[in-house]
Amino acid sequence: MTGEVVVVGDLLLDRDIIGVADRLCPDAPVPVLTEMGTTQRPGGAGLAATFLCLDGLDVVLVGAIGTNEAGDTARAMLEHTGVGLVEIPYDGDTPEKIRLKAGRHPLLRLDRGVAVGRFGDLPVDAVDAMRGASAVLVSDYGRGVTAMPSVRRVLADVARHTPVIWDPHPQGATPVLGAILACPNRSEAAAFSAAQGADLNGRPVLNPAAVAAEARLLRSVWRVGAVAVTMGPEGAMLAEADLVPVTIAAPVNHQGDTCGAGDRFAAAATLGLARGRTVRAAVVEAVAAASHYVETNGLAGIGSELAMEATT
């Protein structure tokens, strides 16, 4: 493998407020959370970049970071982890996803700073990083970076000779022509397929045949090399050109904190493709990595390299 791995996409700040809920509010039937501490980390493309950095790769993140406190915090954490940053000029805020949790159990999610600002010109350093990468992971969180015409032109050109992996979002852009792998989750695949006039999935019950049909449809519509639809504890459904879709089973089936599991899958698949694995081998490794991540309690199991704690 030569060259850095580049992550392109939307940066967020994720925060967990953790406490104890042992009573109800007197004026409404809702729990009262007694705050014990907070944990924060880069989210979105920042989390994917952090995973790759913790996997031992040299990583550059190309994205927009706001000038608010959340942006400053995310920037500092990424730099501490060793992720290189090439920032796209941006006059908006970095959004926050805040989970309120009683122990390990989420009670509520609060989103802040969701308004999208304006982007400036794509820096030359960003173009150079993408063109020189051993692989590019596009981490789309629907904030607009992947819809920038300048970004899409470079990615389409890079995809001709370099693995481009696309982790899509329902409010985001479609993958560029020639991306080697797109990896929507099950609900995203159903939504994307419905947008094409198809209603293939018998939700909420998992229907493997319908998921396979969605994967085939999206691979054809997006004109990408392969589509892997992630299915949580059931693994992933992989559709490649001229091959019957196959289920890549998860090695373990544990229920845990799945927050970040999709980013873990995308990062692990990118790692495999950057190292020259076949798409199928990379997806097998990605399913195993995501499964292990959930089995070891997700973000809480990673340790201080990722989760920066601030007790209150």
Label the model's feature ranges.
Residues 115-118, 143-146, 172, 255-256:
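Short, small-residue-enriched loops and turns at beta-alpha junctions
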Residues 23-33, 185, 198-201, 246-250:
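Short glycine/proline- and charge-enriched loop/turn segments
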Residues 10-11, 141, 264:
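Active-site metal-binding loops of divalent metal-dependent hydrolases
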Residues 221-226, 242-246, 250-311:
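Conserved post-catalytic alpha-helical subdomain immediately downstream of the catalytic base
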Residues 4-5, 13-138, 303-312:
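Conserved N-terminal subdomain of the carbohydrate kinase-like
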